[in-house]
Amino acid sequence: MDAAAPSLADEWAYVSAQTASGLGPDLYERLVQPSSERLAAPFARRTVYYHGCECLDAKAPIIARLPNLRRFHVSPWSSVAAAVRTFGSSVVLEVHAHPGEVFFGASRADMRRSLERLVAEAEGAAIDLNLSDIHSVNGRPGLLGVWAEEAREAGARR
């Protein structure tokens, strides 16, 4: 094989078990985790991303055993503090603000408080603040910029 040719290890694996969100931790560990571990194994440069929109607090200790895990999705329904207890600084926590709160009633001050809370809960961990799964900006697209400014400032105060 040509040494310059890309390999699977050069890519990112997107691991998700959204269809298994209704499974409890025991069934998840028995039925889903083994195939996720096999899927993640070839990504030897630690380029595995785990995504789950549901609350993953109870499953995170199981997911933490994925080989080559580098990035973990912390949805608005998951606890940032629980993710930090599970992963520490071993992965980047992709921490998501709740888009419904941002676009349907939040003031700049509300956004700031929410972001500062997320940052404080993530003390000691590498984080990436995100606002995604946006289905409507409620006629206020400028809020995207406001949220981004507040997120940058919250991160800078860290």
Give residue spans per PLM region.
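Active-site loop segments of alpha/beta catalytic cores
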Residues: 1-158
